[in-house]
Amino acid sequence: MKRYRGWAVLLIVAVSGCASHMGSSESAGLRSPSDAAAIRAVFDMTTAGWNRGELPVYLSAYTESATAMGRNGPERGVNAIGDQMRAGYWKTGRPAQQLHYEHLEIRPLGPDNALATGQYVLTGGGLPNRTGWFTTIWTRTPAGWRMIHDHSS
């Protein structure tokens, strides 16, 4: 019986540690709470750039060697990602629809990396609304937080 009690205590401690980790704030593990805010600011900047028809502003969130996983498989490099965006979401040099994000959640992957998940929503342009979910991996660079991988579906 004592042997089982020891295992029960160990199990409770382990579960408590997992529960406290799962309930941590989005900025825990990053260098400062402002890091999560900085990543959110990049999302805001890219949304504004997209909606103004400035694809280079949208693409500035990616590192040069970023990868993006879309319905046609992986694209490597920011230029290929730009080509993918132009082919699937732009018409005559402008976005076919307006972009916004919902359910954005940022979780730390250490002091210099983060995971962002959420939903993108494309509306307007006389087209049916399009929406999907994404996971992006971010890294701290000298230029600020940038995406190294984007998986959208």
Question: For each of these PLM feature ranges, what is it?
Answer:
Residues M1-A8:
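Bacterial N-terminal signal peptides that target proteins for export
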Residues A8-G17:
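Bacterial N-terminal signal peptides
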Residues H21, T131-S153:
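Short beta-strand edge/turn micro-motifs at domain boundaries
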Residues P33, L55-D112, V121, L127-N129:
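A solvent-exposed, acidic/Ser-Thr-rich amphipathic alpha-helical stretch
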Residues Y62, Y120-L122, T136, H151-S152:
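Short beta-strand segments enriched in hydrophobic/aromatic residues
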Residues I106-A114, T139-G144:
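A short, structured loop/turn motif at beta-sheet edges
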